[in-house]
């Protein structure tokens, strides 16, 4: 071992000295064994894995060889395991190396060829030169090898570039040459890697932009369209491929608000506008993002589809839960309401619900909505008392966007695809009555300060506590709107006319309070009887309020007669009480006649509804009416000329 070490030249690097030290332990200097060689599919697989290195390095080596003027040397490309991937240079030199076993696919490992720059450059990862007797193996003493490693963009060893020649042809600049080539290859690999990564990110971005529900457009300061995703092309009726490169003003008639924002490089955020494209009007909610640069401003425009924005808004604010299944069926009046309510749910025609305050008109409206095909759509409730004059008309009818503020969606548009519940329709201002009539008859709306018609698909359910026919005669309500609403009218009788349903309503309310208070509630029979006997001038609303109050004030959830407020025991003048409905002195004939008259009042003299309410056939009802000299037409509401 000492002898071998002493044979090294005096001025060698520590890398070579350490290599000699390793080699002297397991190999002989005098013997030579050709390196192992990868062939066939194995070598092809290695080359495929190193395609990037080969593509760049082969071009670099060929360029370098052209400037060597036929110098007798060879240039090699090796991978990180010192496997020769490619050779070029002087044919005679290449052939001489091949005789030693340095061919494509040969592994130049230190364990086979000993101390040599081909293997050493890949081990410490630094440029290395071995020449003459610096090689451990005597077979390589006639040769000079210079090798420089190539690193990828992560700093990992990716391969090496080597120059080989006989000692008599070596130059002092050989190592510098391999270093220059290796750096060129490394820089090219880095550039290609960054470009590939940039393209990958760009493809991901394009994929993201194409998969968005929003339309996306981008153009430069000259207005030249640079990007248009498929969604934007669909919304604006444009050809995505043919439109790119054209001026956006040649493709679209931009709204004034957007043109001014572009002129002043001012952003817009969720502004509703209307484009004109291919002779069609297109509604969209837009967001404009200016990109201010030294070379000029560019712009990115997002188009949010109006329908999706409306669906998102209404899904958050327009859901109701009351259904017909929650309504008591103990009373024939309530069964009648359920029957006609389900009929009303089948069509898209407007509905008018009539009745006193607090009889549950909105609950019936909710049940109709949830029974209809529009159940998944919005349910927008509007108290028309808030719109008794046109001051708040902008909220009801919406407004077009201006330079100073965004447009506003109307209540009618918010209800699009669902139900619009108009409470106390008699208070609606005349101007708004006309707008509502336009929606009912034509299915379109004109916003305030706008001229364009907006399609609106809503089912209108209105309520009233007065006789609208009288208001029409007094010119206080639109005659045409009354006719439109009167096409399907449901009269909800007061609670005192639905006494059989009172116990069920009470127990339903108590069950609701049980869940809220997380405690048991029960009511004595005499207390229940007194509640049934009360005339309930405030109807269902009053009933719910009183039940909650007495439940709170009861002892341990036990409602006794003593818990009821005093006024429930006193008869109020002018109100029907339970005892006055059916006096004990009446005969059966008088009771029957009174029941028919009451049914005629409730149904406005509609015989079909009277027969259903009384649970008798129409023929029998006609006979009884003739017997008691009852004329149903006397109870009909006065018809308008």
From Swiss-Prot:
Renumbered residue ranges of the record's region Sensor domain: 1-318
GO molecular function list: ATP binding; ATP hydrolysis activity; sequence-specific DNA binding
Domain GAF intervals: 52-189
Ligand binding (ATP): 355-362, 415-424
Location of the Sigma-54 factor interaction domain: 327-552
Domain annotation PAS: ranges: 203-265
Biological process (GO), any one: regulation of DNA-templated transcription
Gene3D superfamilies: 1.10.8.60, 3.30.450.40, Homeodomain-like, P-loop containing nucleotide triphosphate hydrolases, PAS domain
Keywords (A to Z) from UniProt: Activator, ATP-binding, DNA-binding, Glycerol metabolism, Nucleotide-binding, Transcription, Transcription regulation
Function as written in the Swiss-Prot or TrEMBL entry: Transcriptional activator of the glycerol utilization dha operon.
The protein, known as: Glycerol metabolism operon regulatory protein
Lineage: Bacteria, Pseudomonadati, Pseudomonadota, Gammaproteobacteria, Enterobacterales
């Amino acid at each position: 071992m000492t002898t071998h070490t002493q044979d090294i030249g005096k001025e060698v690097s520590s890398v070579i000295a350490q290599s000699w030290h390793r080699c002297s332990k397991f190999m002989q200097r005098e013997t030579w064994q050709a390196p192992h060689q990868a062939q066939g599919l194995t070598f092809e697989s290695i080359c495929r894995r190193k395609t990037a290195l080969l593509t760049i390095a082969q071009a670099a080596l060929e360029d370098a060889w052209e400037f060597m003027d036929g110098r007798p040397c060879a240039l090699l490309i090796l991978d990180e395991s010192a496997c020769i991937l490619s050779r070029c240079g002087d044919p005679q030199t290449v052939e001489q190396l091949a005789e030693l076993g340095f061919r494509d696919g040969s592994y130049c490992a230190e364990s086979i060829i000993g101390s040599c720059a081909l293997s050493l450059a890949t081990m410490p990862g630094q440029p290395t030169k071995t020449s003459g007797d610096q090689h451990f193996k005597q077979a390589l003493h006639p040769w000079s090898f210079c090798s420089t490693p190539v690193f990828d963009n992560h700093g990992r060893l990716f391969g090496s570039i080597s120059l080989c020649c006989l000692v008599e042809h070596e130059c002092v600049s050989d190592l510098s040459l391999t270093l220059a080539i290796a750096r060129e290859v490394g820089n090219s690999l880095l550039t290609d890697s960054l470009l590939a990564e940039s393209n990958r990110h760009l493809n991901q971005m394009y994929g993201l932009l194409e998969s968005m529900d929003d339309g996306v457009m981008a153009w430069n300061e000259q207005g030249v369209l640079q990007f248009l995703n498929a969604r934007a092309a669909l919304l604006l009726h444009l050809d995505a491929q043919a439109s790119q490169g054209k001026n956006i003003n040649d493709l679209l008639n931009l709204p004034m608000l957007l043109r001014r924002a572009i002129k002043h490089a001012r952003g817009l955020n969720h502004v509703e506008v209307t484009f004109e494209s291919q002779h069609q009007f297109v509604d969209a909610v837009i967001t404009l993002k200016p990109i201010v640069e030294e070379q000029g401003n560019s712009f990115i425009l997002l188009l949010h589809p109006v329908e999706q924005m409306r669906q998102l808004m209404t899904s958050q604010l327009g859901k109701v839960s009351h259904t017909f299944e929650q309504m008591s069926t103990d009373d024939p009046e309530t069964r009648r309401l359920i029957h006609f309510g389900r009929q009303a749910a089948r069509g898209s025609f407007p509905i008018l619900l009539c009745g006193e305050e607090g009889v549950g008109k909105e609950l019936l409206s909710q049940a109709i909505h949830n029974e209809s095909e529009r159940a998944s759509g919005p349910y927008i409730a509007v108290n028309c008392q808030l719109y008794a004059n046109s001051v708040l008309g902008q909220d009801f009818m919406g407004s077009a966007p201006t330079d100073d503020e965004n447009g506003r969606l109307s209540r009618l548009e918010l209800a699009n695809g669902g139900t619009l519940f108009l409470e106390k329709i008699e208070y609606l201002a005349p101007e708004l009555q006309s707008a509502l009539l336009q929606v009912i008859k034509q299915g379109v709306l004109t916003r305030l300060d706008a001229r364009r018609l907006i399609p609106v698909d809503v089912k209108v359910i209105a309520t009233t506590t007065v006789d609208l026919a009288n208001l029409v005669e007094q010119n206080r309500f639109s005659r045409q709107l009354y006719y439109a609403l009167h096409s399907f009218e449901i009269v909800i009788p007061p609670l005192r006319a639905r006494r059989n349903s009172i116990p069920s309503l009470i127990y339903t309310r108590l069950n609701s309070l049980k869940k809220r208070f997380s405690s048991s509630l029960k009511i004595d029979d005499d207390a229940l009887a007194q509640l049934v006997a009360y005339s309930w001038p405030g109807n269902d609303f009053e009933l719910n309020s009183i039940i909650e109050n007495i439940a709170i004030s009861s002892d341990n959830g036990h409602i006794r007669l003593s818990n009821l407020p005093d006024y429930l025991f006193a008869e109020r003048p002018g109100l029907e009480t339970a005892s006055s409905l059916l006096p004990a002195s009446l005969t059966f004939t008088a009771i029957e006649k009174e029941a028919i008259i009451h049914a005629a009042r409730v149904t406005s003299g509609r015989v079909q509804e009277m027969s259903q309410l009384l649970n008798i056939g129409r023929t029998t009802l006609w006979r009884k009416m003739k017997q008691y000299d009852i004329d149903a037409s006397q109870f009909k509401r006065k018809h308008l000329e």
